[in-house]
Amino acid sequence: MPFLSDMLDQSRRQQDEEQALARENLAEASLLQAHLSHRSALRSRFRFDPAAVMDCLRAEVLGQDPALQAVEDMLKVVRADIADPRRPLFSALFLGPTGVGKTEIVRALARALHGDAEGFCRVDMNTLSQEHYAAALTGAPPGYVGAKEGTTLLEQDKLDGSPGRPGIVLFDELEKASPEVVHALLNVLDNGLLRVASGERTYHFRNTLVFMTSNLCAHEIQRYDERRQRLPWRLLPVGGERRRRDIDGMVRARLLKTFSPEFVNRLDSVVTFNWIERDVVARLVELEVQRLNRRLEKHRCRLEATPEVLAKIARAGFDRQFGARALRRSVRHHLEVPLAEHLLDHHQPGDGNCTTYLASLEHERVRFVRR
């Protein structure tokens, strides 16, 4: 019967299409399983996306490409889990003047990896400048009070990090530490361990990113740039590579005068941060406004600023010697204080909707209008 024959042919075609689709799905599933197996092998210890972490860092740290490149290279090695297991995952010394982002890059990294800008162990080396204060890091010797307690400056849980993510420790202002403390750090860089003086406890840094900061060479670099600016333009070196080589030479010479060659030689990376320039300051102002808006979320309001306001803050906040800290003072004086006064006098919580305020210049003063 023609009708039944057509139905049978249609059923066969449908069955063939379903079988072909099933074969395609099986092939795709096999490829997906192989892809996941490959990824899971790399995820056996660390589970984070280096590209996503770097996106967070580049949004927070501006004008410091060499430092960001060093951190990106480090993240790839750590994520692939091919770092030397007998040493810290990574060790770096960040050099440069104040207010250029040496500590901020560590905060941004902690925020990206652990969701908390304070999710790292920070040791202020300024408090360890005297020999008798070294016990705060290395622990009290045997027979002294607190010998079995270890150091009060390190938290092992922050050194270990969170599941699938490395820990972070920052030794701030390294040049101010006593020689005994630097010698203890030599052992940390060498084998990833810090044994307290009593021998009762050992701190492990083998799952840790070790960062150190220092203001060494800041004055030398400033004088170098000032001499360059006084030269006739015909005598100025062409390009920035010459400046980079000169500064690297100055930094290395100063490092070897301050620290032992054994210590410097065990660092994975030494990065000199750039001065904050005018073009970077303009972008930093926008970043500070974004941070202010995050703090305003709890009040259900947000801030928008005209280009004139942003330019005024950038002009007042540009100070090459003091970097971003001078900019933050400008933001506080020209934006946060007037905004706080306006909110205290005029802000009325709405019905749950977000209130937007526009900051504009009026007779060189910042005024706010509700939009």
Swiss-Prot record:
Binding site for ATP: G96, P97, T98, G99, V100, G101, K102, T103
Gene Ontology annotations of biological process type: cellular response to heat
Transmembrane segments: none
UniProt entry tagged with the keyword Chaperone: yes
Entries under Pfam families matching the protein: AAA_2 (PF07724), ClpB_D2-small (PF10431)
Keyword Cell inner membrane included in the entry's annotation: no
Gene3D superfamilies assigned to the protein according to its UniProt record, in alphabetical order: 1.10.8.60, P-loop containing nucleotide triphosphate hydrolases
Necessary cofactors: Mg(2+)
Function of the protein: Unlikely to encode a regulatory protein. Has ATPase activity. AmiB and AmiS may act jointly into a two component ABC transporter system.
Protein's UniProt name: ATP-dependent protease ATP-binding subunit-like protein AmiB
Organism in which the protein naturally occurs: Pseudomonas aeruginosa (strain ATCC 15692 / DSM 22644 / CIP 104116 / JCM 14847 / LMG 12228 / 1C / PRS 101 / PAO1)
Lineage: Bacteria, Pseudomonadati, Pseudomonadota, Gammaproteobacteria, Pseudomonadales
